[in-house]
């Protein structure tokens, strides 16, 4: 597994690198924190571990840059005790978030879970679902409607897949949260709401924002 570890604390970087390499992860770091994208593009990581507080530009800035060109899974690290950091990370399309200090074995478990969730279907045939007059490509995280195509983050696609496989049925928020994250403590009602809102915003680009209905106090429903 190729891991890009964007961490400016060299002591922590070396500790994590040593631990991750014991699990056969290939870990790369950053030499110039003004050129994170250069390393990102040359190393081609399968997962990015991204610190929030970095020199020159913060982790949120680099997350935006990465999302412009890739849906690679991103796990944020932060020493700040600020719930809005979690919300911001979800708004930007991150897959998980951990607050420092943390147990390394928990980080490794999260990385393994993310890898399984994101890459377990890469060797399988193309997987598609039909929803209204659109085709949802689960292998490419895309939705095609006519000549229009939109691309979703992995998290958004997981939410959508859960909903459209249970069309016209209410899916509880707890069900979605359980499917998304192994560590449910990471997810609040607000972070799930943020993800659904981001999904709806993308669906609006193909005039399908009303296809997912909020059932207040119950969950969400995708209409046939």
From Swiss-Prot:
Location(s), subcellular: Cytoplasm
Cystine crosslinks: none
DNA-binding region: 126-224
A single GO molecular function term of this UniProt record: phosphorelay response regulator activity
Domain of life, per lineage: Bacteria
Record-linked PROSITE patterns: OMPR_PHOB, RESPONSE_REGULATORY
Pfam family, one: Response_reg
PTM annotation: Phosphorylated by GraS. Phosphorylated by Stk1; phosphorylation increases the DNA-binding activity of GraR.
InterPro entries, alphabetized: CheY-like_superfamily, OmpR/PhoB-type_DNA-bd, Sig_transdc_resp-reg_C-effctor, Sig_transdc_resp-reg_receiver, WalR-like, WH-like_DNA-bd_sf
Modified-residue entries (4-aspartylphosphate), positions: 51
A cellular component term, taken from the record's GO annotations: protein-DNA complex
GO biological process per UniProt: regulation of DNA-templated transcription; response to antibiotic
Effect of deleting the gene: Decreases the resistance to vancomycin about 2-fold.
Keyword set includes Repressor: yes
Segments forming domain Response regulatory: 2-115
Keywords: Activator, Antibiotic resistance, Cytoplasm, DNA-binding, Phosphoprotein, Repressor, Transcription, Transcription regulation, Two-component regulatory system, Virulence
Residues with the Phosphothreonine modification: 128, 130, 149
Record text on subunit structure and interactions: Interacts with GraX.
Its job: Member of the two-component regulatory system GraR/GraS involved in resistance against cationic antimicrobial peptides (CAMPs). Upon phosphorylation by GraS, functions as a transcription regulator by direct binding to promoter regions of target genes such as adhesins, exoproteins, transporters, toxins, and proteins involved in cell wall synthesis. Down-regulates the expression of many genes involved in RNA and amino acid synthesis or glycolysis.
Listed name of the protein: Response regulator protein GraR
Organism of origin: Staphylococcus aureus (strain NCTC 8325 / PS 47)
Encoding gene, per UniProt annotation: graR
């Amino acid at each position: 597994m190729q891991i890009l570890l964007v961490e400016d604390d060299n002591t922590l970087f070396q500790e994590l690198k040593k631990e991750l390499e014991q699990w056969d992860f290939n870990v790369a770091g950053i030499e110039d924190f003004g050129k994170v994208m250069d390393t990102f593009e040359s190393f081609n990581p399968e997962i990015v571990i991204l610190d929030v507080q970095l020199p020159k530009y913060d982790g949120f800035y680099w997350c935006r840059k990465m999302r412009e060109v890739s849906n690679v899974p991103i796990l944020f690290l932060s020493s700040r005790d600020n719930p809005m950091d979690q919300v911001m990370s979800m708004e930007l399309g991150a897959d998980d978030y951990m607050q420092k200090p943390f147990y390394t074995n928990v980080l490794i478990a999260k990385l393994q879970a993310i890898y399984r969730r994101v890459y377990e279907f890469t060797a399988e045939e193309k997987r598609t679902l039909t929803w209204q007059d659109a085709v949802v490509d689960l292998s490419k995280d895309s939705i095609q409607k006519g000549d229009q195509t939109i691309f979703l983050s992995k998290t958004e696609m997981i939410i959508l897949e859960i909903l459209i496989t249970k069309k016209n049925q209410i899916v509880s928020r707890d069900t979605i949260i359980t499917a998304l994250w192994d560590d449910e403590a990471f997810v609040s009602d607000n972070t799930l709401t943020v993800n659904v809102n981001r999904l709806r915003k993308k669906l609006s680009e193909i005039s399908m924002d009303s296809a997912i209905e909020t059932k207040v106090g119950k969950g969400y429903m995708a209409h046939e």
